[in-house]
Regions:
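Hydrophobic helical h-region of N-terminal Sec-dependent signal peptides
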Residues: 13-19
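Signature for phosphate-centric chemistry
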Residues: 29-144, 148-339, 343-455
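N-terminal signal peptide c-region/cleavage motif recognized by signal peptidases
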Residues: 22-23
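Bacterial N-terminal signal peptides that target proteins for export
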Residues: 2-13
Length: 455
């Protein structure tokens, strides 16, 4: 495990340096934007073993970059700034921030939760690379496509398959019935998981980060850039925006930080054209800390949290079982080129941890140290995806091989191999099936019942 952890760190550094040199977004921006990070691709191919060629792909992907999903943080920041403005208690930087947030509200109007243009572009590019990098896979036989019922997931699927429409003119996106989204929205079908999310330990952990002395001190420093001292005094004591909403200084600053993250769903030209830039309000250390505070929710609810085999990870078992079965069927029948699935970060992250992909399943102690072992921007950026690419040999007596990629990056799995990043399919399948069998999941027909009972 220490070797895998070390190799992941070295690999992360190499990719990070390349991104820093060639990407319009800096490494610091990526590390502070968490699951809101726009998708980044770095070409990293390893030669296929001699005599082998790709013939099938099993895939699960997150929707592309989107507009802010709801107005909550927008409203908090805007209402507090307007209140300060009415009382002439904004600094020049505060006035500029109010102007920017007003612009953000206009950009988001009538688009909450929809894919942004950047998101659409990223999805299209991922599908083009899948087709171009795997010419022996796409023979025009059949592609199965399924999405969650979310409009942005369905649109992501439609954009993705447009690349393949010339080869597959009758290609359609299928959806499980609204009340049976057990493959892609399994997180909605487990009573134990619903209880887990409301767990006092999780709530208290998140609150302890939000109200930590470091959070309060940094929030005060940022507030001084925006408000007069009199207004900061009011904000420290709490300002009531509604019957159930009292906003303190750190709540306001965290809301602004959330908007900073959300801005990354827009392209750099759009940000420049609309004069949107929050960099003057946060230092690098403040960005890193608030990223830790905000992204902790992902780590605890859809990451390894306190137990990398806990209920928040177990619930992805039906999806893993489906991928195992569809892969076996493709190998046996040789009648399908790919299975493509489109869903959410809440789908991809638990699956990655369940598969024990490097960098996804290490438990941090204390929780506040989680960024050293689990980086949301590397695991579940916008348009995140896991691809299983299958290879067969010209010689019938040779084993089927599989390469797993997380966000188009080759990754280590919890098995030994002499041909990294290629693993023998029978060995990998056995490893995962044993894991599922130990949890009592052996038949797709009982998935809903299993999700209802699993603890």
């Amino acid at each position: 495990m220490s070797f895998i952890k070390h190799s992941f760190f070295i690999q992360f550094l190499i990719v990070a340096i390349l991104l820093l040199i060639f990407s319009p977004l800096s490494l610091a921006t990526m590390m502070t934007s968490g699951s809101k990070t726009a998708y980044h691709y770095v070409k990293q191919p390893t030669a296929v073993p001699a005599g082998y060629q790709a013939f099938y792909i099993d895939h699960i992907g997150r929707h592309g970059s989107r507009y802010i999903s709801k107005a909550k943080y927008e409203d908090i920041a805007y209402k507090i700034l307007v209140l300060a403005e009415k009382n002439n208690q904004l600094t020049e930087k505060g006035k500029l921030l109010l102007t920017q947030i007003t612009t953000i509200k206009e950009l988001n109007k009538d688009h909450y939760g929809e894919l942004s243009d950047l998101g659409r572009k990223d999805i299209s590019l991922i599908s083009q690379r899948m087709l171009n990098n795997n010419p022996t896979v796409f023979k025009g036989q059949k592609i199965a496509v399924i999405s969650s019922t979310s409009p942005r997931a369905k649109e992501t699927a439609e954009i993705f398959i447009n690349t393949f429409k010339t080869k597959y003119p009758n290609l359609n996106v299928h959806q499980q019935p609204e009340d049976q989204q057990t493959l892609l929205r399994f997180f909605e079908y487990s009573p134990a998981y619903a209880k887990y999310k409301k767990n006092k330990i999780i709530k208290n952990t998140l609150k302890s980060l939000e109200n930590a002395p470091k959070s309060i001190e940094m929030s005060e420093n940022i507030a001084r850039l925006i408000f007069t001292s009199n207004f900061i005094h009011q904000l420290n004591n709490g300002i009531s925006l509604s019957e159930n909403s009292i906003v303190k200084t750190q709540n306001f600053v965290l809301a602004v930080y959330q908007l900073y993250q959300e801005l990354l769903s827009f392209s750099p030209p759009l940000l420049a054209d609309n004069h949107l830039d929050f960099s003057g309000y946060f230092t690098k250390d403040q960005l890193l800390w608030f990223s830790t505070v905000v992204t902790a929710k992902n780590y605890l609810q859809i990451g390894p949290a306190f137990d990398s085999n806990g209920i928040q990870i177990k619930i992805a078992a039906p999806l893993l079982l489906d991928m195992l079965k569809t892969a076996d069927s493709a190998i046996a029948n040789n009648n399908i080129d790919a299975n493509l699935r489109f869903a959410h970060a809440e789908t991809v992250s638990p699956l990655a941890t369940l598969m024990e992909i490097e960098g996804t399943n290490i438990v941090a102690n204390p929780v506040s140290d989680y960024p050293s072992v689990w980086q949301a921007d590397k695991i579940i950026p916008m348009a995140a995806n896991i691809q299983w690419i299958f290879y067969k040999s010209e010689q019938a007596d040779q084993p089927i091989l599989v390469k797993v990629m997380l966000n188009e990056r080759e990754v280590h799995l919890p098995l030994k191999t002499n041909d990294y990043p290629y693993y023998q399919w029978d060995e990998l399948k056995k490893f995962y099936k044993n894991k599922l069998n130990n949890w009592g999941l052996t038949d797709q027909g009982v998935v809903l019942k299993w999700l209802n009972k699993i603890k």
